[in-house]
């Protein structure tokens, strides 16, 4: 059994920090990783001393959270998978088609801070149960909206954001309270596999259900029943760990600060802010591609093969199926590759996470551009370039989440998740699908209607994504300048060596000549 330090003794931490810099011993992250893995072996079937949850149960909880995340993305991208049928049923333009996704993202975005505040202070399992139940009910109701009431369909899709906001702000913080260091990164990478897999399954399930039932409404009736199962798993299987117990080496509850103090601290955290803006560009690109990718490929096929997409009342979803499969594979491959590269690179460079994210974003831009440029001549080449571009985009999913968790203290993590969601969606995928649709409509205006014009207009609009990707790479490169200092500062907070109140955040109390003395944080961090 791994021994624990006394709660009141902080000297070993300072000694460990000094040794890390001056004597060349292994850094705290490596030691905590080794310690945690040893505990996992010793206590796989026993209750952890600090969390009160066994390692086996912790893994099961992560699997449940993965399942719910999978459902969330399945539901979100089922709509994208059957968008041509929805557009035809409601007789709407490209801009209004983009509005379907934008309304959902806006609701999700504005409710995230509410659930972030609640998630830092109240029972997280209960909050998720209520949110997922509401999401499942509203999703089911949206499938019964008549074709004459597009505005009502928009409202129901907007309300779906309530459930997703309740879940996405909380789930990563639960994983952070169950695991540390490399184990946390591995669990986060598994959790974020649900993003690409859910997206891909959304396209596939949506198109297959529509083809089988002959009605796109049935595509929206798959996830509600699965959502009910998720609620039951949360109630009867999942447990809630104490916040920050593993990092503080004590199960004593943390003291919450005011919401205004939390926000001030987060806004003064450059690594958090810059990585959030970097992730915003990821959201912009993926949001635009997720909604418009299958539609653009369908239009390209119409131009190349002179085919008609929607004969007999049902649209051809071969491209949705292929795009969904590519999204699944590239997402898994990208997340695994990003985590593995970062894990190896960390051994020589503590700035590995933001640097890997930056390389992924910048490298994806030319491949996304080429995928659009070749779409009217070779769909095979287009799919190859999409595969490479989406793989590079997916390098950062788990890494951005990990950055947030290790530069933000435990009592502010749900709030930080919420703030990141607001910014990334407000400036990212809340507007990008609608913006792409508006630009496409404007390019088509005044021109004779044809499949070629429809394809070209969407092609030129989607080219914005390549340039946004390069901007995102710049944000992640800048994050690398601050990541070490912000990480060490968060570690001091979690160990109780730095006050949570930001009024004293720049100074730390240490023994000096027999009495306590405040010294600058930088003197400890160096």
From Swiss-Prot:
The membrane topology term of the UniProt record is: Multi-pass membrane protein
Q: Which family does the similarity line name? A: Belongs to the major facilitator superfamily. Spinster (TC 2.A.1.49) family.
Q: Name one GO biological process term.
A: lipid transport
Q: Which PROSITE patterns match?
A: MFS (PS50850)
Q: Where are the transmembrane segments?
A: 59-79, 98-118, 126-146, 159-179, 187-207, 218-238, 272-292, 321-341, 355-375, 384-404, 419-439, 463-483
Function, in words: Mediates the rate-limiting, proton-dependent, lysosomal efflux of lysophospholipids. Selective for zwitterionic headgroups such as lysophosphatidylcholine (LPC) and lysophosphatidylethanolamine (LPE). Essential player in lysosomal homeostasis.
Supply the source organism for this entry: Xenopus laevis
**Record localization:** Lysosome membrane
* Catalytic activity, as annotated: a 1-acyl-sn-glycero-3-phosphocholine(out) + H(+)(out) = a 1-acyl-sn-glycero-3-phosphocholine(in) + H(+)(in); a 1-acyl-sn-glycero-3-phosphoethanolamine(out) + H(+)(out) = a 1-acyl-sn-glycero-3-phosphoethanolamine(in) + H(+)(in); a 1-O-(1Z-alkenyl)-sn-glycero-3-phosphocholine(out) + H(+)(out) = a 1-O-(1Z-alkenyl)-sn-glycero-3-phosphocholine(in) + H(+)(in); a 1-O-(1Z-alkenyl)-sn-glycero-3-phosphoethanolamine(out) + H(+)(out) = a 1-O-(1Z-alkenyl)-sn-glycero-3-phosphoethanolamine(in) + H(+)(in)
Provide the gene name from the record. Answer: spns1
Q: What is the lineage of its organism?
A: Eukaryota, Metazoa, Chordata, Craniata, Vertebrata
MF (Gene Ontology) = transmembrane transporter activity
Q: Name one Pfam family in it.
A: MFS_1
A Gene Ontology cellular component where this protein is annotated is: lysosomal membrane
What is the protein name for this chain?
Protein spinster homolog 1
